[in-house]
């Protein structure tokens, strides 16, 4: 409807330039920004864990416990994303009769570009054999560019960190009323 929404929490990947990310997140503040590190695998007790305090450097000087780092089980959120993309959506006729979208539906704008859609489905989950012969699940790229999928995964992690998974119905109604 054109309403402007504020960012509740922003997750930023530390994988490429961790010192710069730590410095920027300290400057902006930990209430708004969550430096994250993605880990593969489904054997995590929680999709997001932390924060843990890590050492950071600023201007060549070591800052002990200078940054808060969140760990994200990216496989969990990728699987959730693909599951939500497969949800059956109600038709326009069904919506006119009061049918709602299922929880988790990913709503895409009509103006979304095909390149973005290709990126959001740029990986597939395969069963591969380890060197010792055991089967394990692994995400493999179908195409080189997958930034849209990564952004969705880290946005979902930011929602988790902000506590959206534990918000009561009343909180969601309050947010909806602000639109």
Where are each of the predicted segments found?
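Mg2+-dependent endonuclease catalytic cores in nucleic-acid-processing enzymes, primarily RNase H-like
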Residues: 1-132
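Long, compositionally biased intrinsically disordered regions
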Residues: 103-179
